Amino acid sequence: MLEIEHKPEFLKKIEKIKDRGLKEKIKKHVTKIIEFPEVGKPMMYSRKGTRELYIQPFRLSYAYLKSENKIVFLDLYHKDEQ
């Protein structure tokens, strides 16, 4: 079974979002990631080993550790804050 972990920063940023529609969209994408962990775009260079999924206007960053059968949700940030 797939193990799910959330970083505290990730949860804080989701709590700050006031828009219900956006929260629902994020929830759907998190479910999608859990079902298909390799759905996100693989990152390169300093972010190697992580993946990102674009949820307008945010990017959801996560790590899929295939050997450990684990997903770690790392961050949710505005696309202009890269």
Regions found by a protein language model. Give the residues of each.
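Alpha-helical elements of the RecA-like P-loop NTPase motor core of helicases
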Residues: K12, E24, K41
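Basic, amphipathic "hinge/linker" alpha-helix immediately C-terminal to the N-terminal HTH DNA-binding motif
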Residues: H6-F10
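A short, surface-exposed loop/turn module that caps and links secondary-structure elements
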Residues: V30-Y54
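Enriched for short, Lys/Arg-rich terminal
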Residues: M1-E5, K16, R20-E24, Y54-R59, ...
